[in-house]
Curated annotation (Swiss-Prot):
HAMAP family: Xni. It comes from the Bacteria. Residues 165-259 form the 5'-3' exonuclease domain. InterPro entries: 5-3_exonucl_a-hlix_arch_N, 5-3_exonuclease, 5-3_exonuclease_C_sf, DNA_polI_H3TH, FEN, HhH2, PIN-like_dom_sf, Xni. This is Flap endonuclease Xni.
């Protein structure tokens, strides 16, 4: 039997649904709306296995903040009513047949990346449901990213149009340009156009840095800021070796569960 694993980036979905509600304290409405969303996802994707991955403590910025203290420093805190309603949301999703994985000390992104690449590496189909373009570095013939809200696939043609590089070069791209929304600085003076030019000529940051053929206008910047580039690439890259503590059988989709 062929496998199709769907991984829901839970807070990515929930926060977008919640922010569109007229009354931010009406968590019941948020629950109902997310359930309708999940019903459509289930209908479209027809998964054999499914799981929703949550950042357990969103205010804990994880290991990336330990090596880059400003990382996501300006992230808006989750609204208190929504924070208080997460358990109820997880219960409602469980009743739909979707279990939750809570990150403990690891960023949810790394858990998603580990699970997705592990399954895809065996030739099985994986769909990550998220608007987060950071997942696009994982793209492979059997691993796809679905932006549910824009009704689009974040695929290789999208990455080429958006960034001008290959999915496998995205961490290097962000190492050079930085990620302003997450307070990742990158290399001063290197923006998207320059990063695209560098990564069209060279496979990655290290190849560019080691080459005598790097354009002089970029050589000075890399010479001065190579450690920042390396650090920012490390922060932008997803970990794919997190201990998961469960197997696929545990997240097989068998339909709705009975409410406890």
């Amino acid at each position: 039997m062929s496998i199709h694993l769907v991984i829901i980036d839970a807070l990515n979905l929930i926060r977008r649904v919640h922010s569109a509600q007229p009354d931010p304290t009406d968590i019941a409405r948020t629950i109902t709306t997310t359930q309708r969303t999940l019903t459509r996802i289930l209908s479209e994707a027809k998964p054999t296995h499914i799981i929703a991955v949550f950042d357990h403590h969103e205010q804990d910025r994880g290991w990336r903040a330990e090596i880059l203290p400003d990382y996501k420093q300006n992230r808006k805190p989750m609204p208190e009513p929504l924070m208080q309603g997460l358990d109820a949301i997880q219960q409602a999703w469980w009743e739909q047949g979707i279990d939750s994985l809570l990150s403990e000390g690891d960023e949810a992104d790394d858990l998603v990346a580990t699970l997705a690449t592990k399954v895809a590496s065996h030739g099985e189909k994986v769909t990550i449901v998220s608007t987060d373009k950071g997942y696009c570095q994982l793209l492979s013939p059997t691993l796809q990213i679905r932006d549910y809200f824009q009704h689009r696939w974040l695929d290789e043609p999208f990455i080429e149009k958006e960034f001008g590089v290959k999915p496998s070069q995205l961490a290097d791209y962000w190492g050079l340009t930085g990620i302003s929304s997450s307070q990742v600085p990158g290399v001063p003076g290197i923006g998207p156009k320059a990063a695209k030019e560098i990564l069209t000529q060279f496979e990655d940051i290290e190849a560019a840095y080691a080459s005598d053929e790097l354009a002089p206008k970029y050589r000075k910047k890399l010479d001065e800021h190579i450690e920042s580039a390396r650090l920012c690439k490390r922060v932008a890259a997803l970990k794919c070796d997190i201990e998961l503590g469960f197997n696929l059988q545990d997240i097989r989709f068998t339909g709705p569960n009975k409410a406890e």
